[in-house]
Each structure stands twice: as structure tokens, then as C-alpha cells.
């Protein structure tokens, strides 16, 4: 078992101090140093010893307090569509994690066409560009620089930061923070012993809007001030004055890898499925398929941002055939990396999912009011 896999298992501990192995204790020491560094950095920004850069347009950040998937990319897509439909000229700025484009500014999409592959631009930026045609998508480590390029070269009047909550160098008008409903703080530890990027109590003071995603799909969170957010692990509760909404990952369609034919979601009911995913929380994908009535005979979980090759596809096909699967299903994020490869022998599809925020009208109204007041 490699270091990454051992860390992942520690992060999935049901309790913060279940594993007391030497490896876990060593990571706890590293987490203490990390905590000191991140707290000092945030204090410097809070006291304006470090200054944030203001750009001449509105800036909205979408992020979270843990490493891993909470639905940031679907949320960015939702916001980009909303703002575009209302007549704004949004551009998305991403770190471009996993992409090979290392220039100071990488233009994944100029709004007219997609200019980079997932290998060059990163999985999420290409997915965003494909999902919202007509908006620029740029990557680079310096969001101030990519933001200026989006404004000056592409006419953007609002910037959306994908995974930008901790990037405090660029001032933002709205901070949207996504929390996993089941385990908002993971195992309670900061990196690298746990998935927390910063102490949550301090982090949520900067949040303007909180969205609870994943799990408990039939529950509705209130949007009024003072809504409770439970850790799910220690039972601690944070009371926030920020509005809290419910984010639901809504399956929309089943789309074939061969030709892009759309199929009704009911097609999955009773089907023997071999599913695979290389995303932040693959288990959530499995639960979604099961909720649609699929019989999952094999489920293959790959690391987030995994780069598939021919041997991976051969293994997936062989596994599916041995399990007598009738169909292979993956995520849209994984599908964009399969396009250049040979076709799978079995029928293969990807599940298209969109973010829905409830109550929708209240959320849209609040974002627009904050845009005007910013």
C-alpha cells in the first residue's frame, strides 16, 4: 500500500483518533505544523499585513474547507450558466490541477472554442468549458494574473474562482463554501492527517453563502440565519449567520460514449452495471447509480484525476465481462479523458449530473443582490 492510499484510509476513519499507528502519529505532527502555518497566513490577511488584490470586476469564489469532492465543479457550472443567462460576461479561473499546461496563463477556452485537452488544461476546466459554451476558462497558479487576462483580453465582467476559497491573494465579493452533509470536516484533522485545509470555525467566518451537498438528498436545509451545521463526527455544532442552502447532485441523462446518444435514466433500472470513477468521492457516484435502480456487479474506484490508458480500459472490459455486466457506466469527468482512446466492446455510457440548489429562487436572488452590493 502506497503513502497516498494509507492517507486516504486514515481520512476515512470514522473517529478522529481510531488509528494510533506510528504513521498516523507522524502525520499528526505534520498537521500541527500545517495548522500553525495556515492560521498565521489567515491572520496576516485578516489584519491586512498581507493585502488582497482587487480587480475591476465582481469576483465569486466557490470552494470548501476539505480536500476532495464536494461538488465545486457542478456549482461553478451552475453559477456560470446563471450569470450568462442574466447578461453578464463570466469567466472561470481554475488552478488547473492535473493539467500539463504550466504557462502563467493557460487559455482552456476563449469563449469561442475549447483550445486545450484535459491532459493539457486539466479535467475540471475542460468539463466546465464543454458544459457552458461561450465563456472563457483560464488556468494558472496566479489568479490575479489570469483574472486580468480574462478582463482585458476577453471582456469578462465577473470572475468565478473554481476552488478559490483558500486563495486569499485575490479579493472576492462573494465566498460560496460547499460542505459535505455527512462529514463536513472529514475525520477532524488538518492536512496531511486529515482532509481539512484550515480550521473550520475560523474558515466559516469568511463564508457569505454555505451550501450543504451530498447525502440526505430528501432533506431540505433552511436558508435563514442561524442554521446549524453538524460535524457528523464529534457532534460539535457551528452556528452561522451566513445563509445555508441545500445542494443536490441531480442526475440528468445517460449518454453513450459511442456517438453521444441520450438515454432516459430509467434505462439503468435493473441493469447489471460495471461502474468506474476517478473522482474525489467515488462512493457518491456508486450511491447515485444505486438510487437509479442499477444493479452494480463491479465498481472500480481510481484516484482523482486518474489518467486512463489502454491497459486500464482492457482491465475495465475484462472485469465487466467476468462479472457478466450488461453495461459500463462512468462519470462525465472521466468520459472527457476517454474520448481519444479506442471504444469499449460493451455498451458504455456516462452519467450527466447537474447541481440544483434549494430553495433555487432564494439562492439566485441572494447572489444577484450580493453582486449589486459588492
UniProtKB/Swiss-Prot annotation:
For the ligand (ATP), the binding residues are: 66-73
Q: Which UniProt keywords apply?
A: ATP-binding, Kinase, Lipid A biosynthesis, Lipid biosynthesis, Lipid metabolism, Nucleotide-binding, Transferase
Q: Which reaction does it catalyse?
A: a lipid A disaccharide + ATP = a lipid IVA + ADP + H(+)
Q: What class of enzyme is it?
A: transferase
- Record-level GO BP terms: lipid A biosynthetic process; lipopolysaccharide core region biosynthetic process
Q: Which HAMAP family match?
A: LpxK (MF_00409)
Q: What does this protein do?
A: Transfers the gamma-phosphate of ATP to the 4'-position of a tetraacyldisaccharide 1-phosphate intermediate (termed DS-1-P) to form tetraacyldisaccharide 1,4'-bis-phosphate (lipid IVA).
Listed name of the protein: Tetraacyldisaccharide 4'-kinase
User: Which species expresses this protein natively?
Assistant: Syntrophus aciditrophicus (strain SB)
The record lists the lineage as: Bacteria, Pseudomonadati, Thermodesulfobacteriota, Syntrophia, Syntrophales
Amino acid at each position: 500500500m502506497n503513502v497516498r492510499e494509507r492517507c486516504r484510509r486514515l481520512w476515512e476513519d470514522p473517529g478522529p483518533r481510531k488509528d494510533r499507528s506510528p504513521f498516523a502519529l507522524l502525520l499528526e505532527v505534520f498537521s500541527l505544523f500545517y495548522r500553525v502555518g495556515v492560521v498565521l497566513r489567515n491572520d496576516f490577511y485578516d489584519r491586512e499585513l498581507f493585502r488582497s488584490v482587487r480587480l475591476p470586476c465582481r469576483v465569486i469564489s466557490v470552494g470548501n474547507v476539505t480536500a476532495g469532492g464536494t461538488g465545486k465543479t457542478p456549482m461553478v457550472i451552475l453559477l456560470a450558466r446563471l450569470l450568462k443567462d442574466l447578461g453578464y460576461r463570466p469567466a472561470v479561473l481554475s488552478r488547473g490541477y492535473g493539467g500539463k499546461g504550466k504557462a502563467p496563463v493557460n487559455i482552456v477556452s476563449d469563449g469561442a472554442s475549447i483550445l486545450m485537452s484535459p491532459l493539457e488544461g486539466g479535467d475540471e476546466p475542460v468539463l466546465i468549458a464543454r458544459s457552458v459554451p461561450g465563456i472563457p476558462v483560464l488556468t494558472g497558479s496566479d489568479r490575479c494574473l489570469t483574472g486580468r487576462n480574462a478582463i482585458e483580453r476577453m471582456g469578462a465582467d465577473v470572475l468565478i474562482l473554481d476552488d478559490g476559497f483558500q486563495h486569499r491573494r485575490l479579493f472576492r465579493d462573494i465566498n460560496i463554501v460547499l460542505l459535505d452533509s455527512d462529514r463536513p470536516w472529514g475525520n477532524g484533522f488538518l492536512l496531511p492527517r486529515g482532509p481539512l485545509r484550515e480550521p473550520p470555525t475560523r474558515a466559516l467566518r469568511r463564508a457569505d453563502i454555505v451550501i450543504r451537498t451530498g447525502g440526505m438528498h430528501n432533506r431540505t436545509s433552511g436558508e435563514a440565519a442561524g442554521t446549524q451545521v453538524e460535524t457528523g463526527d464529534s457532534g460539535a455544532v457551528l452556528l452561522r449567520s451566513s445563509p445555508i442552502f441545500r445542494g443536490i447532485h441531480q442526475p440528468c441523462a445517460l449518454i453513450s460514449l459511442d456517438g453521444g446518444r441520450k438515454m432516459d435514466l430509467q434505462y439503468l433500472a435493473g441493469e447489471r452495471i460495471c461502474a468506474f470513477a476517478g473522482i474525489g468521492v467515488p462512493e457518491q457516484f456508486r450511491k447515485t447509480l444505486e438510487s437509479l435502480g442499477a444493479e452494480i456487479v463491479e465498481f472500480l474506484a481510481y484516484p482523482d484525476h486518474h489518467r486512463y490508458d489502454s491497459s486500464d480500459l482492457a482491465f475495465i472490459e475484462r472485469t465487466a465481462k467476468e462479472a457478466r455486466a450488461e453495461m459500463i457506466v462512468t462519470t462525465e469527468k472521466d468520459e472527457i479523458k476517454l474520448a481519444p482512446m479506442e471504444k469499449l466492446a460493451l455498451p458504455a455510457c456516462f452519467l450527466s449530473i447537474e447541481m440544483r440548489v434549494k430553495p433555487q429562487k432564494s439562492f439566485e436572488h441572494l447572489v444577484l443582490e450580493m453582486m449589486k452590493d459588492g
